[in-house]
C-alpha cells in the first residue's frame, strides 16, 4: 500500500483530502481511493505508475473516456478518481468530483480547438489518430504497433474466469481501444473454448457486414488517383483487407474508423452472448429473506448490465425494482428513506438486516410496543380479566376448587349424585342437577323427562328466563305482573328442584338455578320487552328470551 499511496506529496495529499466525492456531500477523498484505483488499473492491464504524474493521468483518461458510455459504474468511478487526481497534479482548484470533470472537459475542448487550428495551418487533418496502436514514426509516417502479449493474456484470463458474464464487454472495450480490425481478430482468435459463443459472434458480424454493404453501395466509375477505395463489410471485418489498407482508412482525410466500426459489431455480438449465458431477467432478481442487502445489490447490478436497454430504462429499473424486489425488512427501511436516497445511503441503512442483532432489535421494539399498549389499557380501565372464577364441586362456594376444600367431602359422584364412582369415571352424559332426597312444601323434586331433556337442545324452541338479579318489585308491580307463590330459599349447587310457581296469572313448573340467579320457564308468553340470550351448562346451550323486572 505504501508504494501505491506514494503518488502524492504532502501538499498534494492535503489538497486531495479536501475534495468531496459529490457536490454538497460530507465524504472526501482519502488514500484508499488511490489504492483502489491502482488495483483497478492493474485489472485493466494499465500501468498504475501513470497515476504519479499529470501526463500519465491524461493518458489514462484518454484510454478510459471512449468506454464510458458502455462501461460499468466501476469504470466510471475509476475515471472520476483519475480526473480528480489529474486536477491535483495540475494544481487546479476544485471542490468536488463534478468540478474536476468540468475542468477536464474544458481542457479537452481547448486542446481540440488548438489541434484543429494547427491542422488548418499545416494543411493536415485534425482527425489523424495519434493513439496506440497506430503511431507516427520519426519520418512522419503512420505505422502500426502490434497488440502486446500482456493485453492478450489479460483478455484470455477474463474469458476463462468470467465466461461471458456482463463485465466482459467493458473489459473488451478497454483492452481494444484504438485497435485495428487485425488486432481485434487476434483477440478473438486467442479464445480457445466457448466455440458455440464464438460462432454466434461470427454470425452477428456477418449480419452487420451485410447491412453495411446494403447501406453503403459501391460508387460506379474508376477510383481517382491518390484516393483509396471505400471499405466493404468484409474489409471492416479484416477478412479482405490488408493492415496497410486498414491504417490508411483510419488515418485518411476524412477518416473511416474501420476499427471502431468493427469493435461496435463485436460488442453487439457479445451482448447477445451475454444474454444467452445470463438468461435471468432483472425482474427475477429478488432478495432472499436472510440475504444481505449488499449481495442482493451486487446480483441486481450484475444482471442489469446484461439487459439490452437504454440508460433511461436502466435508471427506471434501478429506482423501482431495487426497492420493490427487496425483502420486507429492507423494503420498509428503503421506503422510509424516500425516492431520492442514494445507493450509499441504502446500503448503509440496510447494513446488518437479517442478522441476529437486527432480529433482536426488532423483537425488543415489538415487545416494548406490546408492553406500552397493555399499560395504557390497564390505565384506562379497559383491561378485562380473562380467567373465569373457579367454583368448588364439594361445597359449591367460589374461590377454590374441591382439592383445596376444607368442608367434609360429599359422598357419591359430583356429576350424577350416585355412589360407587367418582366424577372422572362417571358415564352419565347429561348432568343430573336434582337430588331425590329433597322435600319441599310445594312439591317433590324429580328428574327431567325425555321431552324436557330435549328442551335443552339448541334446535328446540325458545324458553323464557326470569332475571332475578335486577328486580326489586314493589307491591304495585307485583300485583300487575303476578305474584310468585313461593319464596325461593338459598339452595346449593346440588339442590336444583323443579317447583310450581305462579307468574303472569299462570301456574308453571320452573327450574330454579340459584348459581346463575335465573329462573327458566318453558312454553309461556309474557308481555313486555325481552332480549335474546344463550344459556348453557354441562348439557349444552339453548336459546331463550330474557325478561327483566318480572
UniProtKB/Swiss-Prot annotation:
The record marks 132-133, 363-364, 377-378, 432-433, 440-441, 488-489 as: Cleavage. Keywords: AIDS, Aspartyl protease, Capsid protein, Eukaryotic host gene expression shutoff by virus, Eukaryotic host translation shutoff by virus, Host cell membrane, Host cytoplasm, Host endosome, Host gene expression shutoff by virus, Host membrane, Host nucleus, Host-virus interaction, Hydrolase, Lipid-binding, Lipoprotein, Membrane, Metal-binding, Myristate, Phosphoprotein, Protease, Repeat, RNA-binding, Viral nucleoprotein, Viral release from host cell, Virion, Virion maturation, Zinc, Zinc-finger. The keyword S-adenosyl-L-methionine does not apply. It comes from the Viruses. Its EC number is 3.4.23.16. Residues 73-77 are annotated as: Interaction with membrane phosphatidylinositol 4,5-bisphosphate. A motif (Nuclear localization signal) lies at residues 26-32. Residues 277-363 are annotated as: Dimerization/Multimerization of capsid protein p24. This is Gag-Pol polyprotein. It comes from Human immunodeficiency virus type 1 group M subtype B (isolate CDC-451) (HIV-1).
Amino acid at each position: 500500500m505504501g508504494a501505491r499511496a506514494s503518488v502524492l506529496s504532502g501538499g498534494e495529499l492535503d489538497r486531495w483530502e479536501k475534495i468531496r466525492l459529490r457536490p454538497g456531500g460530507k465524504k472526501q477523498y482519502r488514500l484508499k481511493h488511490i489504492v483502489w484505483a491502482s488495483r483497478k488499473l492493474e485489472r485493466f492491464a494499465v500501468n498504475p505508475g501513470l497515476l504519479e504524474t499529470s501526463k500519465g493521468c491524461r493518458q489514462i483518461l484518454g484510454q478510459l473516456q471512449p468506454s464510458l458510455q458502455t462501461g460499468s459504474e466501476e469504470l466510471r468511478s475509476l475515471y472520476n478518481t483519475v480526473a480528480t487526481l489529474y486536477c491535483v497534479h495540475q494544481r487546479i482548484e476544485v471542490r468536488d468530483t463534478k468540478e474536476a470533470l468540468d475542468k477536464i472537459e474544458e481542457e479537452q475542448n481547448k486542446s481540440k480547438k488548438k489541434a484543429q487550428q494547427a491542422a488548418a495551418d499545416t494543411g493536415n487533418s485534425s482527425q489523424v489518430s495519434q493513439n496506440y496502436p497506430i503511431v507516427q514514426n520519426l519520418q512522419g509516417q503512420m505505422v502500426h504497433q502490434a497488440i502486446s502479449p500482456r493485453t492478450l493474456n489479460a483478455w484470455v484470463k477474463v474469458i476463462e474466469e468470467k465466461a461471458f458474464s456482463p463485465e466482459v464487454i467493458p473489459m473488451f472495450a478497454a483492452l481494444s481501444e484504438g485497435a485495428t480490425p487485425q488486432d481485434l481478430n487476434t483477440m478473438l482468435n486467442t479464445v480457445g473454448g466457448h466455440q458455440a459463443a464464438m460462432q454466434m459472434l461470427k454470425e452477428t458480424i456477418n449480419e452487420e457486414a451485410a447491412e453495411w454493404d446494403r447501406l453503403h453501395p459501391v460508387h460506379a466509375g474508376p477510383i481517382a488517383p491518390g484516393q483509396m477505395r471505400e471499405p466493404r463489410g468484409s474489409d471492416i471485418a479484416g477478412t479482405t483487407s490488408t493492415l496497410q489498407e486498414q491504417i490508411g482508412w483510419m488515418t485518411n482525410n476524412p477518416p473511416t474508423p474501420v476499427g471502431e466500426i468493427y469493435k461496435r459489431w463485436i460488442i453487439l455480438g457479445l451482448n447477445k452472448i451475454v444474454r444467452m449465458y445470463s438468461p435471468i431477467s432483472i425482474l427475477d432478481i429478488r432478495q432472499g429473506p436472510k440475504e444481505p442487502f449488499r449481495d442482493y445489490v451486487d446480483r441486481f447490478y450484475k444482471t442489469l448490465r446484461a439487459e439490452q436497454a437504454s440508460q433511461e430504462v436502466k435508471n427506471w429499473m434501478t429506482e423501482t425494482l431495487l426497492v420493490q424486489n427487496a425483502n420486507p425488512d429492507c423494503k420498509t427501511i428503503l421506503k422510509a428513506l424516500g425516492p431520492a436516497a442514494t445507493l450509499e445511503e441504502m446500503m448503509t441503512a440496510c447494513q446488518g438486516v437479517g442478522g441476529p442483532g437486527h432480529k433482536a432489535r426488532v423483537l425488543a421494539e415489538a415487545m416494548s410496543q406490546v408492553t406500552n399498549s397493555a399499560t395504557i389499557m390497564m390505565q384506562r380501565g379497559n383491561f378485562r380479566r380473562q380467567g373465569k372464577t373457579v367454583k368448588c364441586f364439594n361445597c359449591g362456594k367460589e374461590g377454590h376448587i374441591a382439592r383445596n376444600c376444607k368442608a367434609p367431602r360429599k359422598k357419591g359422584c359430583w356429576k350424577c349424585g350416585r355412589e360407587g364412582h367418582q366424577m372422572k369415571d362417571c358415564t352419565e352424559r347429561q348432568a343430573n342437577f336434582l337430588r331425590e332426597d329433597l322435600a319441599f312444601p310445594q312439591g317433590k323434586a324429580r328428574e327431567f323427562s325425555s321431552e324436557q331433556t330435549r328442551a335443552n337442545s339448541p334446535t328446540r324452541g325458545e324458553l323464557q328466563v326470569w332475571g332475578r338479579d335486577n328486580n326489586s318489585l314493589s307491591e304495585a308491580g307485583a300485583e300487575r305482573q303476578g305474584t310468585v307463590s313461593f319464596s325461593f330459599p338459598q339452595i346449593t349447587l346440588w339442590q336444583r328442584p323443579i317447583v310450581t310457581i305462579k307468574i303472569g296469572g299462570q301456574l308453571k313448573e320452573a327450574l330454579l338455578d340459584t348459581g346463575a340467579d335465573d329462573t327458566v320457564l318453558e312454553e309461556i308468553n309474557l308481555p313486555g320487552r325481552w332480549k335474546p340470550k344463550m344459556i348453557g351448562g354441562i348439557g349444552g346451550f339453548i336459546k331463550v328470551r330474557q325478561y327483566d323486572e318480572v
